[in-house]
C-alpha cells in the first residue's frame, strides 16, 4: 500500500507542478544533494491517509528540506472552523503576526513572535528576539477552490537559500494536496457505509475502513505517475474495461475551442495518428453541452458509423459519460465504453463505476492534459525559435526566404499545401511555391489584392480560418475542378511589418491530422507571422542596401567609361542656334527618309531641331543649354556595339518624330505623353552592352544581380541610366516642372522604356488587338498606356519600315551583335540560341520568322489605329518578300559558307529596282 501511495505522490508532484520537477526526468542532469531528501519527504506526504499521519509527514518534510528546524506546529481546521494544533493542543492566536499571515494569505517571515502571538508555554520558545541566523515562518495553506485558509504551519528554522526556498514551495503545495486527499477519504467513508453492493466482498472493509472499490481506485491512482496523457489513458482505460466488462474503452478529448473531439488511445492500442472529428455533428456534441450520459440508442447513424470506423468493429452497445473538470466545471473529455461482455447494454452500475473512477482520476487527467499542452507549447516555442533562426539566415535572398517560410509554416501546422503572397501595390504576387521558385515572370501568380480569400485577409489584416472551403463564399473552386485537387479547409493569415502594415499573406490548405485548423493553429500562425514579417522586411531592406551598392558600382563604371560633356561641346552645338528641320533635308519629315543617312556629328542638332519643331522647347520652357547638355550626355551614354548604339537611338527618336508629324498624335495623346515618348526613344537603350537579358542572368552580371528579380534587366538599366543623366548637374531638362508633372514624366518614361522588352509587348498584344477592334478611346487611360507601348515598339523596330538595302544592312549589324554574344556564351561553356550561333543561324528564315510574328503584326495594329500608317505595313511586308526571295535563292544555289554573315554578302543580294542615292552613315546606300 505504501508503494501505491508513493506512486500517487509522484503523479501529483509531476502534474500539479506542470513539469517543473527535474528529479523524476531521466534525461535531466543529476539532482542536487537535497533532491533525495526532498523526494523522500514528498513521498511521505503522499502516503498519509489520516490527520495524524499528515501532521507527522508535514513535520518530517519540513525538517528534511529546511535548515536548523527546531519546532514545527501544524494548525488544521476543526469542526467549528477553528485552526487547532494537537501537539501540544492549542488554538491559533487571534492577533499578532500569525493572524496577519492568515488574513493576507501569504507566507510571513519574522525574527520572532510578539506578546500578542504567545499563548503560554506552547509558543514561548518563539518569542523575539531569536538566535542569530534563525527565523519564524508562518505558512498558510490555501484551498484554491474556496479561497480559504485550510491549514497553517508554524516553523522555527534557519535562514533559507534559493534552493531551500524552492523546496519549501514544493512542500507547501503537496502538503495541501495531501490534506485535500485525507479530507476526501474522510468524506468517502460514510458513503461507503450507506451504499449496498450485490457483491458482499466489494463492501467488506479492511481494518482501516476501506472497501475493495476504494483499494482498486487507490491502486489505480498510485499507477498514474506518467508524464504523458497517452500512458495515463492506457491505465485508466484498462481499469474501465475491467470494471464495466467492455471490449473497448476510449477517451474522446474535447479541444479548447469546443469544436472537435480527438482520440489517441482505444483500449490497449495507441493509434499511429490521432483521430479527430467535428464536435458539431450528432449527439456527442450535445453531451458536451448537456453533461448527460448517453447510450448507443441515443446516437445518430452518422455518429455510429464514425465510431465504428474509428474502432474497426461493429457497435452492439455503448456508454458515453462526460468527464467534468472540477476547476472549470466544463467537459474536458467523453469516456466511452463499447460492447459489454455478457450483456446487450451497459447498466447504471457501469455508469457509476466510470463516474467513480474519474472522481479520483479526473484531476490527474486534466492536470496531465494541461501539462501536455504546456509541453506542446514549449516545443512549439522552441520550434518557433528554430524557425526564426532558419529565417534570419536567409535574409540575403527573398525567394529563398519565402521558400523557407513555406516549408516551416507547412511543418508547424501539419498542412498539405502552403502558399505565400507578397503585396505589390494593388496585387498579391506569388513567385514561390511548394515546388520551388519561379524564375520566369510569366509563370508567377498575380491576383487582385481585394479578391478571394487571400485578398480578404490582405485587405482586413485579420486571420481567416475556414473549416469548409467549398461552403465559403470567397472560395473559388474552379481550380479544384480543373486539377482534381480537393481543398477541404484553409487557414489564411496576414504577414505584417513593424508598422502593422500588411506586406503579404500566407495560405495554409488542408490540415493533415485533423478535420480543420484549430484555435491552436491560429495562435501558432499569429506568432509565426511575426517572425515572417520581421524577416521579410529585413530581407527587402537588405536587398535595397545591396541594390544601392550595385548602383554605386554601376555609376562608377559608367563614369569610368564615359567622359563628361565639356562646355565647349554644348557651346559649339548652340553657336548658330537651333537649325530648322527643313534645313536638314527636304524629306526629313517623310516616312521614306532614312535617318542613318545623316552624319553622326549632325545628329545632336537634329534632335534639337525635332524638339523645336514639335514645340516642346517653347511649351515647356526648356533651357536650351540644359537641353544641349542633356542631348550630348545621352549620346555619350551609348556604347559602340554594332547595332544598339547612338545611331539606333537617333533612328528610333526620328521615327517618333515622323509619327508625330504624319499621324497627328496630338489628337490621341497629351503633350506630356508625346514628350515622354520622344525622350524615352532617345534613352531607351542607354549603356547597352550588346547582350540581351538572358545573357545578363546567365552570366550573373552586376545588372542581373540588380534587376533580375524584377524582370527586363536591360530595360530597367536603361531607365536607371536616363535618371542618372537627369540627375547630373546641368542636364535636368525637367528641373522646372511641377512636382506632379515631374513625377508623371518619370513614370511615363519608366513604363515606355520597359515596353521595349518584346516579352512585355507579347504579354499585352491581346489587349492591343482588342483596343484596335473596339477603337481608340481618348478618355480611356488604359488606351493611352497601351498606345504609348505600341508606338514605342514600332519606333524601336522602325528600321524594318525602310527600303530593302537599309533593312538588309541593319540585319547584318544585328547579327554581328548576336554572334558576338553567342561567342561569349560558348566561351562560358553554354550553348547559344540558334539565332546567336554564327555556325547555325540561317538568317533569311530567322528574318522571315521575325517579320511574320513580330514586325508585321505590330505595324498592322498601327495601320488599324492610324490609316495613314498603311505605307509602313506595306514596306515591312515588301521587305519580308525580299527575305523570302533570298531564302529561295540560297536553297537553289546552296549555302555560301559556315559563317552565317556570308548570307549577307553583296553576291547574294536580291536585285533591287531602287537606285543608290547617297552613302549611308554606318549602314548602306539609300533608296528613295
UniProtKB/Swiss-Prot annotation:
Cited Pfam families: GAF, GAF_2, PDEase_I
Region called Disordered, residue ranges: 188-210
Domain GAF: 228-365, 397-536
Cellular component, GO, one term: nucleus
The keyword Iron appears for this protein: no
EC number: 3.1.4.17
One GO BP annotation of this record: cellular response to cGMP
Keywords: cAMP, Cell membrane, cGMP, cGMP-binding, Cytoplasm, Hydrolase, Magnesium, Membrane, Metal-binding, Mitochondrion, Mitochondrion inner membrane, Mitochondrion outer membrane, Nucleotide-binding, Phosphoprotein, Repeat, Zinc
Cofactor: record remark: Binds 2 divalent metal cations per subunit. Site 1 may preferentially bind zinc ions. Binds 2 divalent metal cations per subunit. Site 2 has a preference for magnesium ions.
Activity regulation comment: The 3',5'-cyclic-AMP phosphodiesterase activity is stimulated by 3',5'-cyclic GMP. Specifically inhibited by Bay 60-7550. When repressed, protected from ionomycin- but not staurosporin-induced cell death.
Positions annotated to bind 3',5'-cyclic GMP: 419, 434, 453, 476, 487
Residues at the active site: 644 (proton donor)
Single annotated GO MF: GAF domain binding
Enzyme class of the recorded protein, top EC level: hydrolase
Cleavable signal peptide: none
Location of Phosphoserine modifications: 109
Annotated tissue distribution: Expressed in brain and liver.
Catalyzed reaction equations: a nucleoside 3',5'-cyclic phosphate + H2O = a nucleoside 5'-phosphate + H(+); 3',5'-cyclic GMP + H2O = GMP + H(+); 3',5'-cyclic AMP + H2O = AMP + H(+)
Function, in words: cGMP-activated cyclic nucleotide phosphodiesterase with a dual-specificity for the second messengers cAMP and cGMP, which are key regulators of many important physiological processes. Has a higher efficiency with cGMP compared to cAMP. Plays a role in cell growth and migration.
PANTHER family noted in UniProt: CYCLIC NUCLEOTIDE PHOSPHODIESTERASE
Similarity comment: family membership: Belongs to the cyclic nucleotide phosphodiesterase family. PDE2 subfamily.
Free-text domain note: The GAF 1 domain functions as a dimerization domain.
Name this polypeptide is given: cGMP-dependent 3',5'-cyclic phosphodiesterase
Name of the gene: Pde2a
Amino acid at each position: 500500500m505504501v508503494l501505491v501511495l508513493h506512486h500517487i505522490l509522484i503523479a501529483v508532484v509531476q502534474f500539479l507542478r506542470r513539469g517543473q520537477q527535474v528529479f523524476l526526468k531521466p534525461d535531466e542532469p543529476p539532482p542536487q544533494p537535497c533532491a533525495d531528501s526532498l523526494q523522500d519527504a514528498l513521498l511521505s506526504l503522499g502516503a498519509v491517509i489520516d490527520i495524524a499521519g499528515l501532521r507527522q509527514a508535514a513535520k518530517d518534510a519540513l525538517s528534511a528540506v529546511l535548515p536548523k528546524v527546531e519546532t514545527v506546529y501544524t494548525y488544521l481546521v476543526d469542526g467549528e472552523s477553528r485552526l487547532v494544533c494537537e501537539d501540544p493542543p492549542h488554538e491559533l492566536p487571534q492577533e499578532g503576526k500569525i493572524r496577519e499571515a492568515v488574513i493576507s494569505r501569504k507566507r510571513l517571515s519574522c525574527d520572532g513572535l510578539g506578546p500578542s502571538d504567545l499563548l503560554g508555554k506552547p509558543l514561548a520558545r518563539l518569542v523575539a528576539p531569536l538566535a542569530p541566523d534563525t527565523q519564524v515562518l508562518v505558512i498558510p495553506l490555501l484551498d484554491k477552490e474556496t479561497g480559504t485558509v485550510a491549514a497553517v504551519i508554524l516553523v522555527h528554522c534557519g535562514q533559507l537559500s534559493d534552493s531551500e526556498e524552492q523546496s519549501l514551495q514544493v512542500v507547501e503545495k503537496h502538503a495541501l494536496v495531501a490534506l485535500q486527499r485525507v479530507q476526501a477519504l474522510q468524506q468517502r467513508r460514510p458513503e461507503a457505509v450507506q451504499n449496498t453492493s450485490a457483491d458482499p466482498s466489494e463492501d467488506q472493509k479492511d481494518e482501516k475502513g476501506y472497501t475493495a472499490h476504494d483499494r482498486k481506485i487507490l491502486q489505480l491512482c498510485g499507477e498514474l505517475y506518467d508524464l504523458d496523457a497517452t500512458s495515463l489513458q492506457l491505465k485508466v482505460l484498462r481499469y474501465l474495461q475491467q470494471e464495466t466488462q467492455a471490449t473497448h474503452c476510449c477517451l474522446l478529448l474535447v479541444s479548447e475551442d469546443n469544436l472537435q473531439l480527438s482520440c489517441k488511445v482505444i483500449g490497449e492500442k495507441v493509434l499511429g495518428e490521432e483521430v479527430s472529428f467535428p464536435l458539431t455533428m450528432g449527439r456527442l456534441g450535445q453531451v458536451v453541452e448537456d453533461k448527460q450520459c448517453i447510450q448507443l440508442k441515443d446516437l445518430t447513424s452518422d455518429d455510429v458509423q464514425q465510431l465504428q470506423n474509428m474502432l474497426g468493429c461493429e457497435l452492439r452497445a455503448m456508454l458515453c459519460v462526460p468527464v467534468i473538470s472540477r476547476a472549470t466545471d466544463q467537459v474536458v473529455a467523453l469516456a466511452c465504453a463499447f460492447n459489454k461482455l455478457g450483456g446487450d447494454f451497459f447498466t447504471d452500475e457501469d455508469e457509476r463505476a466510470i463516474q467513480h473512477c474519474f472522481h479520483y482520476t479526473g484531476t490527474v487527467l486534466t492536470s496531465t492534459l494541461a501539462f501536455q499542452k504546456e509541453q506542446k507549447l514549449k516545443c512549439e516555442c522552441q520550434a518557433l525559435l528554430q524557425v526564426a533562426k532558419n529565417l534570419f539566415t536567409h535574409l540575403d535572398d527573398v525567394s529563398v526566404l519565402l521558400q523557407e517560410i513555406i516549408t516551416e509554416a507547412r511543418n508547424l501546422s501539419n498542412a498539405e499545401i502552403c502558399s505565400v503572397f507578397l503585396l505589390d501595390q494593388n496585387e498579391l504576387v506569388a513567385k514561390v511555391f511548394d515546388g520551388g521558385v519561379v524564375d520566369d515572370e510569366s509563370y508567377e501568380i498575380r491576383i487582385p489584392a481585394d479578391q478571394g480569400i487571400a485578398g480578404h485577409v490582405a485587405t482586413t489584416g485579420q486571420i481567416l480560418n475556414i473549416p469548409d472551403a467549398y461552403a465559403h463564399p470567397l472560395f473559388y473552386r474552379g481550380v479544384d475542378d480543373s486539377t482534381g485537387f480537393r481543398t477541404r479547409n484553409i487557414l489564411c493569415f496576414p504577414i505584417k511589418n513593424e508598422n502593422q502594415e500588411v506586406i503579404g499573406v500566407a495560405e495554409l490548405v488542408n490540415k493533415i491530422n485533423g478535420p480543420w485548423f484549430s484555435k491552436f493553429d491560429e495562435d501558432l500562425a499569429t506568432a509565426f507571422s511575426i517572425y515572417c514579417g520581421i524577416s521579410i522586411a529585413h530581407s527587402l531592406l537588405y536587398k535595397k542596401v545591396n541594390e544601392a551598392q550595385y548602383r554605386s558600382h554601376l555609376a562608377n563604371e559608367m563614369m569610368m567609361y564615359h567622359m563628361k560633356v565639356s562646355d565647349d561641346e554644348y557651346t559649339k552645338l548652340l553657336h548658330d542656334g537651333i537649325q530648322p528641320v527643313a534645313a536638314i533635308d527636304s524629306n526629313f519629315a517623310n516616312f521614306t527618309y532614312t535617318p542613318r543617312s545623316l552624319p553622326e556629328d549632325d545628329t545632336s542638332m537634329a534632335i534639337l531641331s525635332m524638339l523645336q519643331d514639335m514645340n516642346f522647347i517653347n511649351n515647356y520652357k526648356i533651357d536650351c543649354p540644359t537641353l544641349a547638355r542633356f542631348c550630348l550626355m545621352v549620346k555619350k551614354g551609348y556604347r559602340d556595339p554594332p547595332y544598339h548604339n547612338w545611331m539606333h537611338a537617333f533612328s528610333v527618336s526620328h521615327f517618333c518624330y515622323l509619327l508625330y508629324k504624319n499621324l497627328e498624335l496630338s489628337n490621341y495623346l497629351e503633350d506630356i505623353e508625346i514628350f515622354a515618348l520622344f525622350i524615352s526613344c532617345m534613352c531607351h537603350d542607354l549603356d547597352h552592352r550588346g547582350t540581351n537579358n538572358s545573357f545578363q542572368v546567365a552570366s550573373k552580371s552586376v545588372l542581373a544581380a540588380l534587376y533580375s528579380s524584377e524582370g527586363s534587366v536591360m530595360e530597367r538599366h536603361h531607365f536607371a541610366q536616363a535618371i542618372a543623366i537627369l540627375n547630373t548637374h546641368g542636364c535636368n531638362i525637367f528641373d522646372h516642372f511641377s512636382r506632379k508633372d515631374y513625377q508623371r514624366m518619370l513614370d511615363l518614361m519608366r513604363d515606355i522604356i520597359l515596353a521595349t522588352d518584346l516579352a512585355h509587348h507579347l504579354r499585352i498584344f491581346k489587349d492591343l488587338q482588342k483596343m484596335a477592334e473596339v477603337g481608340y478611346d481618348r478618355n480611356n487611360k488604359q488606351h493611352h498606356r497601351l498606345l504609348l507601348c505600341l508606338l514605342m515598339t514600332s519606333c524601336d523596330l522602325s528600321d524594318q519600315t525602310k527600303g530593302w538595302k537599309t533593312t538588309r544592312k541593319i540585319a547584318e549589324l544585328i547579327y554581328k551583335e548576336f554572334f558576338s554574344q553567342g561567342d561569349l556564351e560558348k566561351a562560358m561553356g553554354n550553348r547559344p540560341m540558334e539565332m546567336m550561333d554564327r555556325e547555325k543561324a540561317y538568317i533569311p528564315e530567322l528574318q522571315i520568322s521575325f517579320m511574320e510574328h513580330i514586325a508585321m503584326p505590330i505595324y498592322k495594329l498601327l495601320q488599324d489605329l492610324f490609316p495613314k500608317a498603311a505605307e509602313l505595313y506595306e514596306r515591312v511586308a515588301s521587305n519580308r518578300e525580299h527575305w523570302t526571295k533570298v531564302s529561295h535563292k540560297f536553297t537553289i544555289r546552296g549555302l555560301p559558307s559556315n559563317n552565317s554573315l556570308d548570307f549577307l554578302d553583296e553576291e547574294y543580294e536580291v536585285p533591287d529596282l531602287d537606285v543608290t542615292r547617297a552613302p549611308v552613315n554606318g549602314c548602306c546606300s539609300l533608296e528613295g
